[in-house]
Amino acid sequence: MAAKDVKFGDSARKRMVAGVNILADAVKVTLGPKGRNVVLEKSFGAPTVTKDGVSVAKEIELKDKFENMGAQMVKEVASQANETAGDGTTTATVLAQSIVNEGIKAVTAGMNPMDLKRGIDKGTAEAVKAIREMAKPCDDSRMIAQVGTISANGDETIGKIIADAMEKVGKEGVITVEEGRGLEDELDVVEGMQFDRGFLSPYFINNQDNMSAELEDPYILLVDKKISNIRELLPVLEAVAKAGKPLQIIAEDIEGEALATLVVNNMRGIVKVNAVKAPGFGDRRKEMLQDIAILTGGTVISEEVGLTLENTTLDDLGTAKRVNVTKENTTIIGGAGAEADISARVEQIRKQIEDSSSDYDKEKLQERVAKLAGGVAVIKVGAGSEVEMKEKKARVEDALHSTRAAVEEGIVAGGGVTLIRAIAALDKVDAINDEQKAGVNILRRAMEAPLRQIVFNAGGESSVVVAKVKEGEGSFGFNAATEQYGDMLEMGILDPAKVTRSSLQAAASVASLIITTEAMVADEPEDDKAGGGMPDMGGMGGMGGMGGMM
């Protein structure tokens, strides 16, 4: 085991704070509408230019192991804020830096770190309560666009496209961000339920213009097994042919004579039919088939529950206004399922999302909710170069997280104003000794830091602006983009309450850990014994002795 280097007390904290400051100083220059760019070196290709705090934080690794520990802990602040609300990473970093620096000063002056931590924790709880009370619901398209614009560093086109996407697919709909092919941003909206399975045979195509199979007002047969024997399907096919409607089959697989017979029937016009594989795999496939059944008002034919294809009637089939199948995707539009059943299914999946600990599972469950409840929108980001594309895509994703957070917990005045207003709530804190009071005061100063940094980045005088904002009430604040004072909500400078709240909570939680650190352990740096070159190999004797081995 390698030898360890151990540092205690002030010398440990000093090195740690140095690391905190290096990372925070690099991140905080990006804060606000006049935030500066940070250029990140890449191992190949052009460097990345970004104004996204979390991208900057991720890149930073320091040579000194003790300083690096401090930097990594502040990185954790950005990650926590990003995970909870998807934005507010730079604000959280600025808050954490201020709490750490003020807290370490107090500890060095001889105060008890644990009481300081208790004071900070009590203050945070009161401030969070105040932020929640200040929140206003965010339900109209204009507000959503403004939140998106602010989060995308003032890019109005991004705010507008996100607001359009949310309007079209609803609050529950899935919105994904992809790299586009042109210079302009585009929005594609898929109504109804779409899954990534295409037709099993090109002979099902009936619309040559867009190479798709379109069925109007079809019956939908859902089967949880492979179909290879056509005899099993005959009763259903005959019943559907009599009804004079098309049939969409969604099964685990359809092969051999079953598929061949369906193709022949379709081409001869006996029954208009199309077949696709069921989406997903294993248990997820069963769940998704059940989702489609509920959406279309049908039943999944599964031998596990005693249902067989031979005994299937028209009552077991689902229906929809239209089914559109391309080579890669199937879209079911206007499923005839009962609203109450769909709502109950959505609630059930939401419960699973709450109980799930895996991010991947949560994402897949959220997609299922969207497919049942709203629809899917794809924002295709346009840009002039790859460097710009990466930077813009990161901003669009940030803005999307922000708008979701705004819809969830409401909005508050942006530009650091809400934190300034929440300072008043710290007077309610029940601090039982001077050290806890000092902890509350550390938080009081830290909550001014984001506004100070926004003003500093805009080239203004921080102290003057903070004093003026404190004199005002409600959402009165400083618009750094225009350098004017006024009502932040009216000027459209909004932040999601969830982002402001989670920034403060993440910063206080990690900063408290740093303040209460008393010892640090790291690997001793290893000496390079070989001196950089290869050791002497004794000339290898000219290899002449190898002749006898032939």
Swiss-Prot record:
<dbReference type="InterPro" id="IPR027409">
    <property type="entry name" value="GroEL-like_apical_dom_sf"/>
</dbReference>
<keyword id="KW-0143">Chaperone</keyword>
<dbReference type="InterPro" id="IPR018370">
    <property type="entry name" value="Chaperonin_Cpn60_CS"/>
</dbReference>
<keyword id="KW-0067">ATP-binding</keyword>
<keyword id="KW-0413">Isomerase</keyword>
<dbReference type="InterPro" id="IPR027410">
    <property type="entry name" value="TCP-1-like_intermed_sf"/>
</dbReference>
<dbReference type="InterPro" id="IPR027413">
    <property type="entry name" value="GROEL-like_equatorial_sf"/>
</dbReference>
<feature type="binding site">
    <location>
        <begin position="479"/>
        <end position="481"/>
    </location>
    <ligand>
        <name>ATP</name>
    </ligand>
</feature>
<dbReference type="GO" id="GO:0042026">
    <property type="term" value="P:protein refolding"/>
</dbReference>
<feature type="binding site">
    <location>
        <position position="415"/>
    </location>
    <ligand>
        <name>ATP</name>
    </ligand>
</feature>
<dbReference type="Pfam" id="PF00118">
    <property type="entry name" value="Cpn60_TCP1"/>
</dbReference>
<comment type="subunit">
    <text>Forms a cylinder of 14 subunits composed of two heptameric rings stacked back-to-back. Interacts with the co-chaperonin GroES.</text>
</comment>
<dbReference type="GO" id="GO:0005524">
    <property type="term" value="F:ATP binding"/>
</dbReference>
<feature type="binding site">
    <location>
        <position position="495"/>
    </location>
    <ligand>
        <name>ATP</name>
    </ligand>
</feature>
<dbReference type="GO" id="GO:0140662">
    <property type="term" value="F:ATP-dependent protein folding chaperone"/>
</dbReference>
<comment type="similarity">
    <text>Belongs to the chaperonin (HSP60) family.</text>
</comment>
<feature type="binding site">
    <location>
        <position position="51"/>
    </location>
    <ligand>
        <name>ATP</name>
    </ligand>
</feature>
<dbReference type="InterPro" id="IPR002423">
    <property type="entry name" value="Cpn60/GroEL/TCP-1"/>
</dbReference>
<dbReference type="GO" id="GO:0005737">
    <property type="term" value="C:cytoplasm"/>
</dbReference>
<comment type="function">
    <text>Together with its co-chaperonin GroES, plays an essential role in assisting protein folding. The GroEL-GroES system forms a nano-cage that allows encapsulation of the non-native substrate proteins and provides a physical environment optimized to promote and accelerate protein folding.</text>
</comment>
<keyword id="KW-0547">Nucleotide-binding</keyword>
<keyword id="KW-0963">Cytoplasm</keyword>
<feature type="binding site">
    <location>
        <begin position="87"/>
        <end position="91"/>
    </location>
    <ligand>
        <name>ATP</name>
    </ligand>
</feature>
<dbReference type="GO" id="GO:0051082">
    <property type="term" value="F:unfolded protein binding"/>
</dbReference>
<feature type="binding site">
    <location>
        <begin position="30"/>
        <end position="33"/>
    </location>
    <ligand>
        <name>ATP</name>
    </ligand>
</feature>
<dbReference type="GO" id="GO:0016853">
    <property type="term" value="F:isomerase activity"/>
</dbReference>
<protein>
    <recommendedName>
        <fullName>Chaperonin GroEL</fullName>
        <ecNumber>5.6.1.7</ecNumber>
    </recommendedName>
</protein>
<dbReference type="InterPro" id="IPR001844">
    <property type="entry name" value="Cpn60/GroEL"/>
</dbReference>
